């Protein structure tokens, strides 16, 4: 397990940038501080699956102003950091994606959640999320080293 690499999901990114989204913070203060550390040092590396940005634009692109803010204050800021990566959906991630089964009959994962979880599997690192379905799934299946919420 890599102790210095973390995959960040959409709800964690929204929590960190809660002032832009005018949203509640859903992750712990220690997870916020970990993300903040990556924005101010190169001690740790953050991985953002491309699905995070797709989900942001689908759910939060309400007008041109918020779209511009997402691009300039979030996307470019991450893109320009040496210790942050926007990860594409590659073959290994796809293979891990296909290994993920629905956790409960009445609670299916959406494609974004599965891609994000599969990215953490591929990178063999912890996931920063507050998504209870992903947390429960990993408790049952133990496919990634851990989840920080």
Stretch-by-stretch model annotation:
Residues 1-48, 60-73:
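Short, well-structured N-terminal submotif of metal-dependent ribonuclease cores
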Residues 1-5, 23, 38, 115-149:
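Acidic, PIN/NYN-like endoribonuclease modules and their adjacent C-terminal/linker elements
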Residues 8-9, 48-49, 106-111, 131-132, ...:
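Histidine- and aromatic-rich ligand-binding microenvironments
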Residues 13, 53, 134-135:
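A generic structural signal for short hydrophobic patches within well-formed alpha-helices
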Residues 19-20, 59-60, 100, 140-141:
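Residue-level signal for well-ordered alpha-helical positions
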Residues 45, 83-85, 142-146:
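Conserved beta-strand segments of alpha/beta enzyme cores
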Residues 83-133:
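Active-site neighborhoods of divalent-metal-dependent phosphate/nucleic-acid chemistry enzymes
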